[in-house]
């Protein structure tokens, strides 16, 4: 927001420099982005009056003038401006004046005619105003007055950045209020008399959406002269705040917006078919806006309408059909309180952003509308004349915001600030902020002001006290606390260890947004509802992720589109699962996910390129699990998932509970996501594997180990892991290792069956095993496999 320093100082004028004022504003939390002078550096320019104006005898585009600058005689000045004429009040640079760029004014002759000065335009004085010709000053401008004094040009435009919670400072009144509080100065609110009604005209209002518009005011002003020029002081104040002058009606509403922070609008009364309705848009309605564009309205948009249809998008943009123009005689002024949630995001969905919507979506003082209406009426009648009707107001108290009641404990205040502030000082600060305060038993009971939507909790009050007390007034003290050693169990597994292992395995870590495209997510999780954001950054980031795969696969596509065919990525983060049983209706789970695509190894002359498959990623996952305490407990059970290949996917099970999934991306899903080649993915709950197996040191056996290889035939549906688990369960402690080293299907093996080659390592720590001992272990294993899986030895 931009504002004029001199305008703020009309309200409150602390005895400090511009630099000090800007520093003070920044420390209040209203960060100053820049300060610019409102005019260039010049001197010797005064208010003049063109007494005579005649055509130059030797130049068609020049005029010879005599100008009164309040001296002993009239000055002869040659001027080329097309708007130069007799009786005009002008900005006259006299002999010796210095204009921006160190341009000095001297007596000279132009085409043979003497010229003792220069009639200046805005641009020649370094003033940013779009105009052609010289400056036209009001007729009551006093001749001979220094122009810098007359237009208050020794002023600065200050630009500040506001956080969304400080909508109360989007006005001169709000900024002045803050400066007054910190300097302990009273704010000089401009005095104006309420305009009494002189006509009986009223407007019938129908409030059909009170939850979106709890308060709505209209007022008729008839016989308005919209051709009247806006006074120079009004134009200058608008200009210094970054708004150009348009016509007196628009200028007045913009002035109220800047001064009080209340957006207003004016309708041409002749173009409004009463009653005026405040309602939600209907499907199929359209509105031609003031800029000539047509908005196709959505049913979530609040409208101002009449009997013939929409008049304006409430709080955002007016309609062309009901707008004020040069032929307008009677107007209807509007001031309203629109609920922030009814306006937030609506302007963006139509590609709009206005000063009005910027304020309404952050929150406008809900007690300001009548004051703003009175102030605007007074200014309008002063500038344009007119006859005024009564203010017509419709309000719904049930939907108006309620003032927040907040308790602040002395203990909490001291703990957060680390400094004790006297009770009287705290009470004084809160009172000066416009809050209602009472104190008893070391607790302040505070009622927020109507303009402070952001005062909701105890910490908000602590922040306010710290701002006004001054951060620099809080002494620096080293924290005093009892330190405790961080408890770290030997069984705890650090996530960084897993990340390092994945990086060592040629993966790269990715960090993607938690907000994802719902269309992409529906490809991966078609049967699962996601948490949809009501006010997203964009349509492509409007849903919370159900898994990390949406972001990771998007990263794979990004790399493939840039000729990176071999991609291995992993990510850790939260996924968000809608759950009515969880807090706030969403379950947040921390997971580890990885994807791989392309060749198994980088291109090399000694080897043939092979594409990755399910078992490559499974092997990497098993390597990760080997660092945890769950490696021998985790099982991979065949299971189908909508986005995965039905023959190449599995659930990751731990103690009978599914903790993740792994598989090859379904070709149809890969096509929809724009991916090339085979892509393999996994995702697993981190907390389920976040412990590691504590190493148990054992003496190496002095006795020889014995290996026995078995080739057993089982049904094709039997999982090899189940076979290995069965061996471990029945063989006893002498079976130290069991491994699968070959799988065969073909000649010699019945159809629908497969041959599993497994090795048994049998060893005793107490003695050398005899052949009978070894055969006994093998016999027990074969018997169990036959009973459980109907397995038999392959011939």
Swiss-Prot record:
It is found in: Cytoplasm. Coiled coil: none annotated. Binds 2 magnesium ions per tetramer. GO terms for biological process: phenylalanyl-tRNA aminoacylation. Residues 39-148 form the tRNA-binding domain. It catalyses: tRNA(Phe) + L-phenylalanine + ATP = L-phenylalanyl-tRNA(Phe) + AMP + diphosphate + H(+). Residues 701-794 form the FDX-ACB domain. InterPro entries: aa-tRNA-synth_II/BPL/LPL, B3/B4_tRNA-bd, DNA-bd_dom_put_sf, Fdx_antiC-bd, Fdx_antiC-bd_sf, NA-bd_OB-fold, Phe-tRNA-ligase_IIc_bsu, Phe-tRNA-ligase_IIc_bsu_bact. It comes from the Bacteria. GO terms for molecular function: ATP binding; magnesium ion binding; phenylalanine-tRNA ligase activity; tRNA binding. Mg(2+) binds at residues 454, 460, 463-464. Its main location: cytoplasm. This is Phenylalanine--tRNA ligase beta subunit. It comes from Pasteurella multocida (strain Pm70).
